Amino acid sequence: MLNVGFIGFGSRASGFWKRNLAPFGLCTVKAIADPRLEEIKAVWGEELPDCTWYTNAEEMMEKEKLDGVFVGTRCNLHTKYALLVAKYDVPLFLEKPVSITDEEIAQLESIPHMDKKTVVSFPLRVAQLVTVVKDIIDRGVIGEVAQVQAYNNVNYARVYYHGWYRDTDITGGLFLQKSTHDLDYINYVLGRTGPKTVCAMESKLVFKGDKPAGLKCVDCPEYLTCSESPYNIEKYDTKRVIANAKCCYATDTGNHDSATVLMQYDDGLCVTYTQNFIARKGAGKRGARFIGYKGTVEFDFNSKTVTYYDHMSDRVDNISIQSTGSHSGGDLKLAQNFIDVMTGKDVSHSPLSQGILSAKMCLAARKSAQTHTFVEL
């Protein structure tokens, strides 16, 4: 049985354990370090009887003999704890983004020995939809890729304006929160080491306003009439209600509500990626179109489809991928890969170097949007 330690055991880490790691029956939660110790023990204590509990990650790493560590803290602590785990040379599952500043990226680049034993949480790159698209492209079916058009219309985006994700000091902003996934799978499908130039623009046209900073929805005089209050959201979108929601029209919401990134690779290939956080319900889409001289292949995570268009005939192939599980089944594949890394059977399929590359691209996009300049990588 593999002994896994968790640094941070919030909804993402605990959910990943229960839905993806635990079902294999090969791991046990040996230790958890989280400052919310008593709160977490109250929920998980009975289910994890063999777990040793800590409030301090350094103490956990010093005292426990672990086969692997899952870092599931908030984003501004990912690098700090990756460096801690690296001191013990233990396989690491690291949540994205791996870093939110250039300084943190430099720190991660100082631990190259962790590259192939770190599984970065990039489940989209290993989702079956992406695997099918990559296979089509690698076989030369569409010819050399001449353009990529990628998109993400996030229909569950209230969390980025009502909850803690609105604090960009913690998250680094929505390029690092959302784009990091998509830019990674684009690099992976293309088999590229990243673009040479990045530029981006962002806008904030909806979730802005002059309400007081820190205002909670329940304390607002417009609670019963505001279409974004939990009171009204509950009527038509019950899965998207945020507990203790803060006003998304306050002065401290942070985060753009739409943005577009343009990237150019060494050979001149141009890639566009656009994201918005205004679309709702059926308007949600996430995927990309890869265009070559001989054909086009596109996919969409929401509809679970891959479509191939032959440019030389009227042929159109539609492939339905009925993947189940979070992130289109990618989380389960990452969990299996992490187990294989811990047992020495395989190396990471989403190594630290790719997490660093994606973070660099996102930071370049953020800098470009803020300075209205092209940024060289």
Could you tell me what each predicted segment is?
Residues 1-48, 186:
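N-terminal Rossmann-like dinucleotide-binding module
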Residues 1-3, 144-147, 270:
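Residues that mark the start of a beta-strand
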Residues 12, 35-39, 281, 324-336, ...:
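Active-site loop of classical SDR/Rossmann-like NAD(P)-dependent oxidoreductases
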Residues 49-111:
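Beta-loop-alpha module in the N-terminal Rossmann-like domain of NAD(P)-dependent dehydrogenases
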Residues 68-70, 266-267, 298, 303-305, ...:
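C-terminal helix-rich "cap/oligomerization" subdomain common to oxidoreductases
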Residues 76, 99-162, 167-175, 180-183:
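A contiguous active-site-proximal alpha/beta segment in oxidoreductase catalytic domains
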Residues 159, 177, 181-303, 334-340, ...:
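Contiguous beta-strand/loop segments that form the cofactor/metal-binding neighborhood of enzyme cores
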